[in-house]
A protein has these predicted regions:
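Active-site-adjacent structural elements in enzyme catalytic cores
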Residues: 1-150
Length: 150
């Protein structure tokens, strides 16, 4: 499933994806995608048990809800927890590695009556959002399974 995302440490970029999706970042859940386990520990508090669980299951389709660190953007400092992901998708993880920063992400905006197919097809995503986002990355047809929250 495709998502909308931005540089995870740039406040204006985060505000922009929230405007596109019409959500309030202080009230709605956004997740951060990290490149590897060591980068996860920069943005979330990871104890030994959680580390072992993450090491066994990541990269993979999981979102871990963890206590955040003070390295998160100001928008999230009033929140105790943050959703952390390290998906089994080399494209997005490589972008995070090259940026040396997490990717802030949320599901694509959609209406309840819409076919979810557009969330899996980069060409359909480009038709719908190409004028309001900077870039649509074509990683091929995706699945529609959301991540499991841990």
């Amino acid at each position: 499933m495709y998502a909308i995302g931005c540089h995870g440490l740039k406040e204006r970029a985060i505000e922009r994806i929230c405007r596109i999706k019409e959500i309030d970042p202080r009230k709605n859940n956004l997740s951060i995608i990290c490149y590897d386990l060591s980068s996860i520990s920069e943005y979330a508090k990871v104890d030994n048990n959680i580390f072992k669980l993450m090491k066994h299951n990541l990269p993979g389709p999981f979102t871990f809800i963890l206590n955040g660190t003070n390295r998160l953007p100001k928008i999230f400092r009033n929140r105790k927890e943050v959703g952390i992901r390290m998906p089994d998708n080399n494209i997005i993880r490589e972008i995070a590695r090259l940026l040396d920063a997490p990717i802030m992400t949320t599901t694509l905006p959609y209406e309840e009556h819409e076919d979810l197919e557009y969330m899996t097809d980069p060409e359909l995503i480009d038709e719908k959002f190409g004028d309001i986002v900077d870039l649509v990355i074509d990683g091929g047809i995706g699945g529609i399974e959301p991540s499991t929250v841990v």
